[in-house]
Curated annotation (Swiss-Prot):
Residues 77-89 have a biased composition (Low complexity). Processed by MMP2 and MMP9. The modification Phenylalanine amide is found at F121. Induction: Down-regulated during the progression of melanoma in vivo. Diminishes MMP9 expression by effecting reduced NF-kappa-B binding to the promoter. The modification Phosphotyrosine is found at Y112. This is Metastasis-suppressor KiSS-1. Metastasis suppressor protein in malignant melanomas and in some breast cancers. May regulate events downstream of cell-matrix adhesion, perhaps involving cytoskeletal reorganization. Generates a C-terminally amidated peptide, metastin which functions as the endogenous ligand of the G-protein coupled receptor GPR54. Activation of the receptor inhibits cell proliferation and cell migration, key characteristics of tumor metastasis. Kp-10 is a decapeptide derived from the primary translation product, isolated in conditioned medium of first trimester trophoblast.
Amino acid sequence: MNSLVSWQLLLFLCATHFGEPLEKVASVGNSRPTGQQLESLGLLAPGEQSLPCTERKPAATARLSRRGTSLSPPPESSGSPQQPGLSAPHSRQIPAPQGAVLVQREKDLPNYNWNSFGLRFGKREAAPGNHGRSAGRG
């Protein structure tokens, strides 16, 4: 792949990643970049650009501000006083449905052998020096 094609591919991927519509990035009829296309992609030298990036693309900055970077959840209409910026940590635990039967977990999981997939396949034997010390084995 020659350098021109690799640069075009890189610019295409960057432009699509930042939300530019496909019609603005790549025109199907004309595959060679012109001065107008270079200006729309921001490829001109920094002295040649007429507007800074934030002024040229207000839609992209508006999209970013709509996503929100706040750590607290959106305010609820319950009317409870809440300090701004502080929120209760949400539990990732999934609640059990009503009437669900709880399954008892094994407590001696470290005593099992585990395969490379994280599945247990057998109970570990006692250490070689502990032959006479294990009372439960017959």
